[in-house]
């Protein structure tokens, strides 16, 4: 039995899983308190601390042999989607935080530690920096500024593969609009196995979300920034974490918001409907990218558990394509499946050092 260790580091947790033959043999989420992490100067310095806990997990499950180790991909250079072999250039970029710091940077670093111990390869799959934008999609409208591809690539691509399989097709044969509904919302136009355009909420595109602003009237927002004398870090925090439903209702949890609506709160109802309205508009935008040839519109992420949200969006876009709902996320399984496709020869592992994105 070829067992794969999956490592998914978060800011205050490390999710671990063991997979074989498409089955999850064991899964555990290790929680890290603020006090435990306080002594560490940065994310990378937590390597030994987390490594010890992972070693204990493997010992508990009597793991003496592995086929491979896979970690969540961190902040790297923009690269096409796929499964990448962890190499020295990747490790150097992560250890030096060349492209910024994030807990996910530990994914490849920790995967490499255990890959060396078990004498097996280490991989990452579809990191957040996946960039498959077609050249026209990079144009922003102002010389000197390019649009970026940032979104929930791992979950978007994994769910798209699952829905394609359900439809009797491969991901590479299909066209999908994938909508990841969470605290942040991202949309992707998936065309024959590539995410050729996105709605990047992190940079202030698209619909408002439980905590993000989405697209704002630029002149009014610029005036607001000047009047409030905001720094660039404050602007980023505002549009990516303190806007949307949080700014209108003081709440980001859709369960609480829906309870307010059930109790007769018309204001909550108004702004939740507004969010769904804007999401539907962005789905229409992605439909244009795919020129109307769409196998399905896929709604995924935590907010896809909300029947209210799903219904509000669906009734506006069912004329475009069939709606498929896949609530939650499947990151751990997606990491395993990416590696399994390489181990079985279905795909070839990609080389990070040689990876380049399509520009013009």
Curated annotation (Swiss-Prot):
Gene3D superfamilies: 3.30.420.40. It is found in: Cytoplasm. InterPro entries: Aliphatic_acid_kin_short-chain, Aliphatic_acid_kinase_CS, ATPase_NBD, Butyrate_kin. GO terms for cellular component: cytoplasm. One of its GO terms (molecular function) is butyrate kinase activity. GO terms for biological process: acetate metabolic process. The keyword NAD does not apply. It holds the Pfam family Acetate_kinase. SUPFAM superfamilies: Actin-like ATPase domain. Keywords: ATP-binding, Cytoplasm, Kinase, Nucleotide-binding, Transferase. It catalyses: butanoate + ATP = butanoyl phosphate + ADP. Its EC number is 2.7.2.7. Belongs to the acetokinase family. PANTHER family: ACETATE KINASE (PTHR21060), BUTYRATE KINASE 2-RELATED (PTHR21060:SF3). This is Probable butyrate kinase. It comes from Enterococcus faecalis (strain ATCC 700802 / V583).
């Amino acid at each position: 039995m070829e067992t794969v260790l999956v490592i998914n580091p978060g800011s205050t947790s490390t999710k671990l899983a063991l997979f074989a033959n498409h089955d999850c043999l064991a899964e555990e989420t290790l929680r890290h308190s603020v006090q435990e992490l306080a002594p560490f100067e940065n994310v990378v310095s937590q390597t030994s601390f987390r490594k010890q806990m992972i070693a204990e997990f493997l010992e508990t499950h009597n793991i003496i042999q592995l086929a491979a180790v896979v970690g969540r991909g961190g902040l790297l250079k923009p690269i096409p989607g796929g499964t990448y072999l962890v190499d020295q250039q990747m490790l150097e970029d992560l250890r030096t935080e060349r492209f910024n710091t994030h807990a996910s940077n530990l994914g490849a670093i920790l995967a490499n530690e255990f890959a060396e111990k078990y004498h097996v390869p280490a991989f990452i799959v579809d990191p957040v920096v996946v960039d498959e934008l077609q050249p026209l999609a990079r144009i922003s409208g102002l010389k000197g500024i390019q649009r970026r591809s940032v979104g929930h690539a791992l979950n978007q691509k994994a769910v798209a593969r699952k829905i394609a399989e359900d439809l009797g097709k491969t991901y590479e044969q299909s066209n999908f609009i994938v909508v990841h509904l969470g605290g942040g919302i991202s949309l992707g136009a998936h065309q024959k196995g590539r995410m050729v355009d996105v709605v990047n909420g992190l940079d202030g595109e698209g619909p408002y979300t439980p905590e993000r602003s989405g697209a704002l009237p630029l002149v009014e927002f610029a005036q607001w920034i000047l009047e409030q004398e905001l720094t660039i870090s404050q602007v980023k925090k505002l549009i990516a974490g303190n806007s949307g439903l949080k700014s209108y209702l003081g709440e980001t949890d859709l369960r609480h918001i829906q309870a307010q609506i059930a109790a007769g709160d018309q204001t909550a109802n108004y702004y939740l409907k507004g969010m769904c309205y804007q999401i539907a508009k962005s789905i229409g935008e992605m439909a244009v990218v795919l020129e109307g040839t769409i196998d399905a519109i896929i709604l995924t992420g935590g907010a896809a558990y909300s029947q209210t949200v799903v219904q509000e969006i669906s009734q506006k876009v069912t004329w475009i394509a069939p709606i498929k709902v896949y609530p939650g996320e499947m990151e751990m399984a997606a990491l395993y499946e990416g590696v399994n496709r390489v181990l079985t020869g279905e795909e070839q592992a990609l080389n990070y050092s040689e990876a380049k994105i399509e520009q013009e």
